[in-house]
Regions:
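Catalytic cores of nucleotide-sugar-dependent glycosyltransferases that transfer UDP/GDP/TDP-activated
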Residues: 2-486
């Protein structure tokens, strides 16, 4: 009997669920490997072992090996641990002087660069000792940007590494890992000629993400539209020229969400479970419960709009602030959950004080409350300035909560705007970053909700029928792996 050759993939990243999480990157690194076809791919993950990991997670780790490596002009300890989680093999790089502390990321950018340069070199150095020779290393964001560089530079001579390919995924182009050339050259030990404008140098600094983009065999980002946007100066964060040059190797693949965790039929956080068949009767019971819990006027018929977000400019809070007073004159309720810039936190608190029966400000973060908001609200507002992928709108669609979004990045790719003439669409959208354009779109949604309820429910039907599970995304990543490995 013939046997299929297992393609070996290694994920390298700075965080991953369930071990450590600060943002959406961890969800991707923790979820995607679970859904890659185990018959054809052997997928493993490398992340740092942070001292601030929860104790129950640390208890799962087993010692594998340790060694010493030349790094930053000294001989440095590298410990390697491992764990199995949801059928995926995880490895951890252990060095308390780099990964100690109360949080994964520190506030000193120079030290962060040293820390992740160490991580990149340690991952590559550890592989021969683990008896795992990946065909492809899948890197994520600037923290692993040096892996493609090191692969082509100091590790390229060894037989073990010679045919290894690399791909880098850009989750947010804003963060690039920049510091002065002299320091970064000293830390990384790379030759001087690597710090030219066609390699790691950008605008007189060394740039680790740029290094990854230049040296990786392919580049991906987290939605088709964002892949196009980052080739333009407005979204390109200074790297648009390079991304245009690499456009043949650049592709967008939308992130998924975990349909096990986000499922209105089985969600333990919500008062009343519901599904695509019975939402017309059952979903409103969650609204009633949330109105009582948050002290809003209890009214089944009142349109409730939700927002679960960091309260920052990137998320469009300046647009909301500009028209908030006008919006509060409408026959709606507005529920906000999240923290962020002080002026926006205070703005939301002010309107909660002024319109207590209409606005509920929850200036903290709670996973349980976020689920309740997704289940209770009729619409979900997401007017981002830029949004590489966005997960909130995918969760909203899953819960039959109609997204109102700005057409940018992943929002444009995942929310189909309502067309009343063709009776299509899964949400509402506006094009320009303009507060009154947003307000007009919200008011159009209000009109459909109040005056054409059957049409509204059909939008909900279509929203709940979309499939943005990880299974779909994993299929697209597998195609790319096949293309790269051959």
């Amino acid at each position: 009997m013939w046997r299929v050759y297992m393609k070996k993939i290694l994920f390298a990243a700075s965080e991953g669920v369930p071990f450590i999480k600060t943002g959406g990157l961890a969800d991707v690194v923790g979820s995607l490997p679970k859904y890659i076809d185990k018959e054809y791919f052997d997928v493993r993950v490398f992340i740092p072992k942070y001292t601030c990991m929860k104790q129950e997670m640390k208890d799962k780790l087993r010692y594998v090996t340790h060694f010493y490596m030349d790094f930053n002009w000294q001989n440095v300890y590298v410990g390697v641990l491992e764990a199995e989680e949801a059928g995926v093999h995880y490895y951890f790089i252990d060095n308390e002087s780099y990964f100690g502390g109360f949080k994964p990321y520190g506030d000193d950018p120079r030290y962060e660069i040293e820390k992740y340069a160490y991580f990149c070199k340690a991952v590559l150095s550890a592989l021969p000792l683990l008896n795992f020779q990946p065909d492809l290393i899948h890197c994520h964001d600037w923290q692993t940007g040096l892996i493609p560089v090191y692969l082509k530079e100091r590790f390229h001579g060894g037989d073990f590494y010679r045919n290894m390919k690399s791909v880098i995924t850009i989750h947010n182009l804003k963060f690039q890992g920049k510091w002065d050339v002299k320091t970064v050259q000293s830390i990384t030990g790379l030759p001087e000629y690597y710090f030219t404008s066609d390699k790691l140098e950008a605008y007189k600094d060394a740039n680790l993400l740029k290094g990854g983009i230049v040296f990786a065999d392919a580049v991906t980002t987290v939605s088709d539209t964002y892949a196009e946007e980052i080739k333009t100066p407005f979204y390109g964060e200074g790297l648009d020229g390079l991304l245009r040059a690499r456009s043949h190797d650049l592709r967008g693949i939308v992130n998924g969400i975990d349909y096990g965790e986000f499922n209105p039929e089985t969600d333990k956080n919500i008062v009343k479970a519901y599904n695509a068949v019975n939402f017309r009767k059952e979903k409103v019971k969650n609204k009633r419960a949330l109105q009582e819990e948050l002290g809003l006027r209890v009214d089944d018929k009142k349109m409730m709009i939700g927002l679960v977000s960091r309260l920052t400019d990137q998320k469009g809070l300046d647009l909301i602030a500009y028209v908030m007073d006008e919006l509060c004159q409408d026959d709606i309720q507005f529920v906000v959950l999240g923290t962020g810039e002080e002026r926006y936190e205070n703005m939301v608190r002010h309107f909660d004080w002024k319109y207590g029966d209409k606005v509920a400000a929850n200036i903290y973060y709670s996973d349980a409350l976020s689920h309740k908001i997704y289940a209770a609200c009729d619409a979900y507002l997401m007017p981002s300035l830029f949004e590489p992928c966005g997960l909130s709108q995918l969760i909203a669609l899953r819960y039959g909560t109609v997204p109102i979004v700005r057409e940018t990045g992943g929002l444009k790719d995942t929310v189909q705007p309502y067309n009343e003439y063709e009776s299509t669409g899964t949400g509402f959208s506006f094009t320009n970053y303009n507060a009154h354009e947003m307000l007009n779109t919200i008011r159009y949604a209000e009109h459909i909700y109040y005056d054409r309820k059957r049409e509204w429910n059909k939008i909900v039907d279509r929203a709940m029928a979309t499939d943005y599970s990880w299974k779909v995304s994993a299929g697209k990543y597998q195609e790319m792996y096949d293309w790269l490995i051959g």
